[in-house]
Amino acid sequence: MDKCPSDQQQTDTNRSIVAHPWRHDPEPTSRPAVTALSEEELALKEHVSAFAKEVIGPKVREMDDKGVMDPEIIAACFEMGIMGIEAPVEYGGVGLGFTAACVVIEEIAKVDPAVAVMVDIHNTLNITAFNRYATTEQKEKYFPRLCKSALSSFCLSESGSGSDAFALKTKAEWDEASQEWVLNGTKSWISNSKEAEIFIIFANTDFSEAHKGITAFIVDKSNPGIAVGAKEDKLGIRASSTCEVTLENCRVSKDAMLGKRGQGYKMAIELLNEGRIGIGAQMVGLALGAFENTLPYLHERKQFGRSVADFQGMQFQYARALMEIEAAKVLVYNAARLKEAKAPFVMEAAMAKLKATEVAQSTASQCIDWLGGIGFTKGMPAEKYYRDSKIGTIYEGTSNIQLVTIAKQIQAGYRV
């Protein structure tokens, strides 16, 4: 019979947990597993899974070879309603939660991580930014487009500001005569930029205030002061466009400011913390896609008169691989649920992205090993998953930045 701790022991246990602010839920709860989906989320998962396989699947190889996102795929994503997951229904959105967005990203990433990151950035960064910081007038103006047809881009990074993202040089100056903001600078490594119609631009309105001068602006593609450069020829997620975005005397009205002046730093930090969960979902989907595309071959392939999947040495490997994928998925959905519950989630988001990225890389690599020589060719999807997985260690905070974030959160719990 299990021994129950005394009241004093229980009190001591609770006290030790509460003492560290990075521990969030010390009390036992009756909630289901964090990966358990609501009826709405489950229906969405099944719907998106079928869409990804039937609509995106046939075009994956061609888009990867050409390094171009098929416009029909972008249009289909809007038609499906998955480009406004968290946008309010009254503006044309779906009105679901953040976890639903993660479900969509994961399911698409199983088929093509490049399409998944397009959907991810549009939803977890840009739709969230408009949800949280846009005025009523801005929501009325932009949400119908963002939900129905206009792809968006999040323009923070610059060539001289990588992990130190807020060392940006793009400036915004107020022109009293015309009553406009004038933006000048160059953004680098901007996802979705080739196809985007709406850009969120981060610029500094006063360099003497350092990061406190950073402000976000909404810029439309039709603005003559914005230009998108050539598409980068990347190792992976090749269909996802990555370009320079140049602002040259780009004039916008005062109504184009997203949020308040000087709020850009806080805005970007918040959005990137949430966006990391979306990247975690992408990496979990990638790992599952590689795994699920490889396992049938292991059962079909015969060596020494037996299915390769029947060899114990192989069983140990794919059993451990799926265990790691499930562990990463739990971290991702735990972070998503915490974010939805408005609980602290910064450390959990960093853990989720880091773990999911590591698992995606290791799973994709193992899948090539399991397939043997054929896995090293473009005849099997494993090599694409392998190439696509690498970006997870780089964008929306490198793996080392995630470790720094986790360490800072832990330290905060022990400071006197």
Predicted regions and their residues:
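Short Ser/Thr-interspersed hydrophobic loop/turn segments at strand-loop and sheet-helix junctions
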Residues: 81, 105-109, 203, 219-224, ...
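A short, Trp-centered hydrophobic/proline-enriched beta-strand micro-motif
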Residues: 148-157
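Flexible, glycine-rich active-site loops centered on histidine and acidic residues
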Residues: 127-133, 154, 208
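Alpha-helical interface subdomain recognition
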Residues: 2-121, 133-138, 149, 176-177, ...
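Short Gly/Pro-enriched turn/cap motifs at secondary-structure boundaries
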Residues: 119, 160-163, 189-192, 206-208, ...
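Flexible, small-/acidic-enriched active-site or ligand-binding loops
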Residues: 167-169, 222-253
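A short core secondary-structure module
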Residues: 180-228
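Long, acidic (Asp/Glu-rich), low-complexity accessory segments flanking structured domains
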Residues: 249-267
